[in-house]
Amino acid sequence: MGLKIFLVASECVPFIKTGGLADVVGALPAALKKLGAEVSVLIPKYSMIPQQFRKEMQHITDFSIQLGWRNQYVGVEKIHREGIDFYFADNEFYFKQDYVYSSGDFEAERYCWFSKAALEIMQKLDIVPDIIHLNDWQTGMIPLLLREQYSALPEFSRVKTVFTIHNLRYQGLMNPMLVNDLLSLGQNALAQIEYYCNINCMKAGIIYSDAVTTVSPTYAKEICTPRCGETLDGLLRHKHIAGILNGIDKKLYNPWTDKALCSRFSKNQPQGKQKCKSALQTALGLEQSEERPVAAVISRLTNQKGLDLFRAVIPGLLDLGAQLVILGMGDAEYERMFADLAAINPSSVAFRAEMNDALARQIYAGADIFLMPSAFEPCGLSQLLAMRYGAIPVVRETGGLADTVIPYNRFTDEGTGFSFRNYSADELYNASRAAIELYCGDKAAWQRLTARAMAADFGWSRSAGEYLHLYKTLKMN
């Protein structure tokens, strides 16, 4: 019998997604299962989960838990897919909204409920894992509750916890009086996770978990420095942080079988990519041109993603002949910026303020270049998907971008993309210009570069093996 892993998170594909966390939680269990582990997953039952999945759910049990002065309902639904049990913690008061995340005291209460419900669900369903694998601040209180209130129970006495930091910037700050009222924590525990007169859920996960990981080797180093540590670098320097690179689901993201594309292609049969480019230009109202490179951005529109650099860079890229496609939602200032650019340059710039998976795949497939100049990037999945679909990434050397994109060397004809070091509009422009000039000036070299990028293997098998090794090490200790 393999190791039993209980993976707890706030989102998971294909059920609900706002970012890369969902992709990881959706793909890692299957990769671990292939290596012999027994994996189950728990997320909240959001009202936004599509009806097609809600119809699959089987009601397992329901009960009440004490949360502050209230008894709160906990329902448990289950979907069994490809040998993995996906559980959904149900409470309509907390999760029947038209959003996944919010802010303020209600957000704190939602995930306090979810944290306590997760441990109670394991008890009620007799799930006794070897490892509870937790993800980001929404689950950070679980290892604290486990140690303070559940560790004396026989079923939890030997359980180990792994806490993965997907993005250190979002830490889950809560009112101490509210947290104490909801979870009845002792003053010592509250003092341990105090953060400038707040309670910090990310800090709780880091302190109380048996092992802490993050999603790339470079990001693991960066968050231990004041520049990237989001004021927790001092704490992180006293923990061993394992940097395990995220992967992508190669079966789910495959340009040879992707039904969202008008034509299939692969590194050995790349002809269909040009058809995808032509279809994208037509669909978005861009000038039909094989010679003009299409540069794409698919991103949350926030300052983390380096979007302020584009203000100075985009006019120069258009002067070089590039077309620009942007897909994403976020801060109003960036939505206005890209909407204005598209209105002024309708044959060269297209902007869609939406989250559309099918369109994203069509953009990856139709783009020649993928721009990702992040201020910081814990891992990044977009550059991996871009390479998978033959779009050459132009990235800043930070976090997982530095770990996954090999800079192009025109003398040795090696590399899988273009990169720049400093957070600078000039450096972004120069790296983008190098990509555009290679595309326009040396088609043979570009085709070889594209083939290398598409051949790069960022599947989950290697990363799952690293997680499994960590789990086994924890269990033996």
Predicted regions and their residues:
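Catalytic cores of nucleotide-sugar-dependent glycosyltransferases that transfer UDP/GDP/TDP-activated
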Residues: M1-N477
